[in-house]
Design a protein with these regions (language model features):
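Bacterial N-terminal signal peptides
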Residues: 8-15
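Glycine/tyrosine- and acidic-biased, solvent-exposed loop/turn segments at the edges of beta-strands
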Residues: 17-276
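Positively charged n-region of N-terminal signal peptides that target proteins for export
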Residues: 1-4
Length: 276
């Protein structure tokens, strides 16, 4: 009886060894299976979100999809031999939030499909848009221009020199100034010439430039900050004032409408499972 039991235990041990579970680990950008570079399609958790994608010899290659908790697509990443060449981000309603390409082109959208910002790496042109979709500020290597929501130009500079666009400067009794175009006030300047406020056509503050601090701030018509530039730090906000996009030097973050960071590298990978 003991011999039969020993034989059965030996057979069982052999079967377990033959059908042993491979231990997968993602470390320093490489997927391993039992310590060897793994190939195949995997599902795993990156932080709190589920991800599915293909690895070849340990490195990401092909399309990777990251999902919201309800199963809707949050991010689509395209990898070529470990390099992320294109990224698409989506709102929970399925609307495209933004696209990034390896040539550093950038497009960001609100959840109604209207553009927030574009950057063309080939031309060096950057455009920030009003809520109604019209350009607010257009900049490139040679010139910059600011517009109100009705496409009326309020300021332009070429080769670091201001361009005459038909505005006149009016001094007020308190020492401050008003910038007037077509008999309408388009900007206000303090007495020291340090704080400039450009206005919407309906009078609300659209853009505030503080020459003393170096801070530039754009506003929605509701008064919430749309965009703020402070040195190397730039922040773009949703209409309710929550951050959408933050850039500090060469690092950047993108947030969903609840204020949760959704675009990041696979920093913490758990629950790895090979599916193909």
């Amino acid at each position: 009886m003991k011999k039969i039991l020993s034989a059965l235990l030996l057979i069982f041990a052999i079967l377990l060894s033959a059908c042993g579970v491979v231990k997968y680990e993602y470390k320093d950008g490489v997927m391993y299976g039992d310590g060897k570079e793994a190939t195949g399609t995997f599902e795993f958790k990156a932080g709190k979100y589920k991800v599915k994608g293909n690895f070849v010899n340990g490195v990401p290659d092909g399309l990777f999809e990251e999902y919201y908790p309800d199963g809707n697509i949050m991010i689509k990443d395209t990898f070529v031999n470990g390099e992320n060449t294109r990224e698409e981000l989506y709102y929970k309603n399925g609307q495209l939030m933004g696209t990034f390409a390896d040539d550093e082109d950038l497009k960001l959208y609100y959840n109604d499909g209207k553009l927030v910002m574009t950057y063309n790496d080939k031309t060096g042109e950057s455009i920030i848009y009003h809520e109604n979709g019209n350009p607010l500020m257009v900049t490139n290597d040679k010139e910059s221009a600011i517009y109100n929501e009705n496409k009326e130009m309020l300021f332009k500079v070429e080769n670091a020199k201001a361009v005459d666009i038909g505005t006149t400067l009016k001094k007020l009794e308190d020492g401050s100034f008003e910038l007037v175009k077509n008999n309408k006030v388009v900007a206000k300047i303090d007495a020291n010439g340090e704080l400039i406020k450009y206005l919407y056509s309906t009078g609300e503050t659209m853009l505030k430039v503080n020459e003393a601090t170096g801070v530039t701030e754009f506003f929605f018509k509701n008064g919430n900050t749309f965009m703020k530039e402070d040195g190397n730090k730039n922040v773009l906000n949703y209409k309710d004032g929550k951050p959408l996009y933050e850039m500090d030097g060469n690092s950047w973050k993108i947030y969903n409408e609840e204020g949760e960071k959704i675009a990041e590298d696979f920093e913490l990978v758990t629950n790895i499972k090979k599916v193909d």
